[in-house]
A protein has these predicted regions:
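N-terminal auxiliary interaction/assembly segments of multi-subunit proteins
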Residues: 1, 5-233
Length: 233
């Protein structure tokens, strides 16, 4: 296991922007604005990474055509349960009950989350290189995830979500090292990364400025129609 903070500087910036932007995916589900932070990416063998996962998870394998590779999104069941419960009016609390499969409703929420994550990642990557992320398959047991060989190296990007009054939770996005290899020079380049960081900073500042503009909202609750004769009485 090794940290690649310096080797893949641009990827760290992409992850930081993703952490700020992906909150918009979870806000409609959780009905509160979560705080999401990114950890420095790490390189591990897929066997080492998957051995640290529980036997029951949501694992979504997606294709990145431009890089001729793939991406794996990993969500723990407690994370899925929380988003599902809150989305349909339940309490904002973690369900730790042991189980081995997701409900049909949870499967729909998993799809919503993964679609949102993919769209945000596409936006966050485009300053470095355009990518399109397409769903391929979904699995619930890490042993059956047809992602890469067990000895292959993967870059694991972990994100932690913090919400009021409950323990923090995390989810992962993993790329095979081979998938990002064609971009290694771009990902290591401080010059290219500075461009990415500059573009991200400008966009983030603009978004923040727009969201802080006060808006005057008026609402007509009713418009009664009264004749002049009744009004004069």
């Amino acid at each position: 296991q090794m940290c690649i903070r310096d080797s893949y500087y641009a990827l760290r910036l992409i992850n930081e922007r993703f952490a700020r932007t992906v909150r918009g995916v979870f806000l409609p589900l959780l009905r509160v604005q979560p705080r999401i932070s990114s950890f420095p990416p790490e390189v591990k063998s897929f066997e080492e990474y998957s051995s640290g996962l529980d036997a029951f998870m949501s694992l979504t394998n997606s294709r990145i055509d431009e890089l001729r590779g793939s991406m794996l999104t990993v969500l723990p069941p407690s994370f899925v349960s929380l988003c599902t419960s809150s989305r349909y009016g339940g309490k904002l609390e973690v369900n730790d009950a042991s189980r081995t499969e997701f409900t049909a409703t949870e499967e729909k929420i998993i799809e919503v989350i993964n679609n949102g994550i993919s769209q945000v990642l596409e936006q966050c990557w485009k300053d470095l290189t355009p990518i399109s992320i397409k769903f391929q398959s979904r699995e619930q047991n890490p042993q059956f995830a047809a992602f890469v060989e067990s000895t292959d190296l993967v870059i694991v990007c972990s994100f932690v979500m913090q919400l009021p009054n409950i323990d923090s939770m995390s989810f992962d996005v993993a790329y095979p090292l081979q998938t990002l290899k064609p971009l290694s020079s771009l990902l290591r380049s401080r010059v290219q990364s500075d461009v990415v960081e500059s573009n991200m900073t400008w966009r983030d500042k603009l978004e923040k400025a727009i969201l802080e503009i006060p808006l005057l909202v008026k609402s007509n609750l009713s418009e009664p129609v009264v004749s002049m004769s009744k009004l004069l009485r």
